[in-house]
UniProtKB/Swiss-Prot annotation:
Gene3D superfamilies linked to this entry: Succinylarginine dihydrolase (3.75.10.20)
Catalytic activity: N(2)-succinyl-L-arginine + 2 H2O + 2 H(+) = N(2)-succinyl-L-ornithine + 2 NH4(+) + CO2
Enzyme class, first EC level, given as a word: hydrolase
Organism: Yersinia pseudotuberculosis serotype O:1b (strain IP 31758)
Keywords linked to the UniProt accession: Arginine metabolism, Hydrolase
Protein name per the record: N-succinylarginine dihydrolase
Pfam entry (one): AstB
HAMAP family with a match to the protein in the record: AstB
Pathways involved: Amino-acid degradation; L-arginine degradation via AST pathway; L-glutamate and succinate from L-arginine: step 2/5
Gene: astB
Description of how the protein assembles with itself and partners: Homodimer.
Gene Ontology biological process terms from the UniProt entry: arginine catabolic process to glutamate; arginine catabolic process to succinate
């Protein structure tokens, strides 16, 4: 049976704004208080989706979450009508209003960790919602994510959905942004690589400036839930030094597809041992690791972070080669572009680059890889996915028109308290659930 790596990209939400909420994410803090353009942000994401779908890649769409999250504010003691809640929090806790209005669910690489059926003992695709414990504005996503994913992957014969791990420091889990899969054909067993920033119950190397968001204990728990074979699972510590330079998730410093791992030389602690372990486990599957390690002398960690070179999408092509999807910022940086130009002109597996303008997302700290959740599916599983979320030319037009109808073209912090913005969002999302055939997935629809 054939297998596919399907990308499910997040639609940017109507409250996309620059609040600097993500300590450790340097783009987020750098652009705090800038004016955003939610309409442009959504269209930039849709254009990337369409371009990849036009190339023949399977492409799905995941909806944004309801924001501002009025229900969260009520749990925190705000009361009265929705308008009164917004007014009260804007006056007395403005940073809290910004947090509950974040459109960060667009970065679906953090929605969940996904293991294909070929790797799971029960032969089903497993999803574990990420608790995103380290950041409040992200942690509040888990409840709705746990409703959205079963609305898309809605067949118990093929899909297993696990709720988020307990939201405690010991079990901080950031989802697929700290997870890679290395092997051959998508439908065949592969090695699952979990990357963590620190150990919660043991001493060890940790960053000193920025937080390590993912724990080894969380990664191990997800692997157990997904019924993975320990012989085909590796747990790797990210280099604390690069976390302190703004590499808040592993997908800011590494990306993989099939048997190719593209990463910075400083990405991992004990890198030589890590690569030896992966090679050994891949050999058990009769696969050979192709390790593309970018030297610090050619591309510094600082340049990798500012351009999101590794927050790219590595896509397998029909001719056996690979395509690298990069943000415009990578082309604009002389040293990064020089490296990439030499890379694709060589005899390695990556022979093509596609550049996308994703500046609205990039300024908040999310590149091409952040915007997508990779889900490996075989033919039967792909047929079991809610077909209305799969991007077609007609759906692209419908979603573009939907964005034009509902999204504002500029947004500042003061706009978040506007009750009209809340109503605009609910009207738009209610319509979107009908377009994508999701059912009542949002709190306002269920209440």
């Amino acid at each position: 049976m054939a297998g596919y790596e399907v990308n499910f990209d997040g639609l940017v939400g109507l409250t996309h704004h620059y609040a600097g909420l993500s300590f450790g994410n340097e783009a987020s803090t750098t652009h705090q208080n800038h004016t955003s353009n939610p309409r442009l942000a959504a269209k930039q994401g849709l254009l990337k989706m369409k371009a990849l779908a036009d190339l023949g890649y399977k492409q799905g769409v995941l909806p944004p979450q309801e924001r501002p999250a009025i229900g969260v504010l009520r749990k925190l003691g705000f009361s009265g009508s929705d308008e009164q809640v917004l007014s009260d929090v804007a006056r007395n806790a403005p940073r809290l209003l910004s947090a509950v209005s974040s459109a960060s669910s667009m970065w679906t690489a953090n929605a969940a960790t996904v293991s294909p059926s070929a790797d799971s003992a029960d032969g089903r695709v497993h999803f574990t919602v990420a608790n995103l414990h380290n950041k409040f504005h992200r942690a509040i996503e888990a409840e709705t994510t746990a409703v959205l994913l079963p609305a898309v992957f809605n067949n118990h014969r093929h899909f297993v959905h696990h709720n988020a791990l307990p939201s405690v420091t010991l079990l901080g889990d950031e989802g697929a942004a700290n997870h890679n899969r290395l092997g051959g054909e998508y439908a065949s067993p592969a090695i699952q690589m979990f990357v963590y920033g620190r150990q919660g119950m043991e001493s060890g190397a940790v960053p000193g400036r920025y937080p390590a968001r993912q724990t080894r204990e969380a990664s191990q728990a997800v692997a157990r839930l997904h019924q993975l074979d320990p012989k085909r699972t590796v747990f790797v510590q990210q280099n604390p030094a690069v976390i302190d330079q703004g590499v808040f998730h592993n997908d800011v410093i590494a990306v993989s597809n099939r048997n190719v791992l593209f990463h910075h030389e400083l990405a991992f602690l004990s890198s030589t041992q890590v690569m030896d372990d992966i090679r050994c486990k891949m050999a058990g599957l009769e696969q050979q690791l192709v390790n593309i390690e970018v030297p610090e002398a050619e591309v510094s960690v600082a340049d990798a972070v500012s351009t999101y070179l590794f927050n790219s999408q590595l896509l397998h092509k029909a001719n056996g080669k690979m395509l690298l999807v990069i943000p415009q910022e990578s082309q604009d940086n002389p040293s990064v572009w020089r490296y990439l130009s030499e890379l694709v002109s060589g005899d390695g597996p990556i022979d093509e680059l596609r550049v996308f303008d994703l500046r609205e997302s990039m300024r908040n700290g999310g590149g091409p890889a952040c915007l997508r959740l990779r889900v490996v599916l075989n033919d039967a599983e792909l047929q079991a996915v809610n077909s209305r979320v799969m991007l077609t030319p007609a759906l692209f037009v419908t979603l573009n028109n939907w964005v034009d109808q509902h999204y504002r073209d500029h947004l500042q912090f003061k706009d978040l308290a506007d009750p009209h913005l809340l109503q605009e969002g609910r009207q738009a999302l209610d319509e979107l659930t009908r377009i994508l055939n999701l059912g009542p997935v949002y709190p306002f629809q269920r209440n």
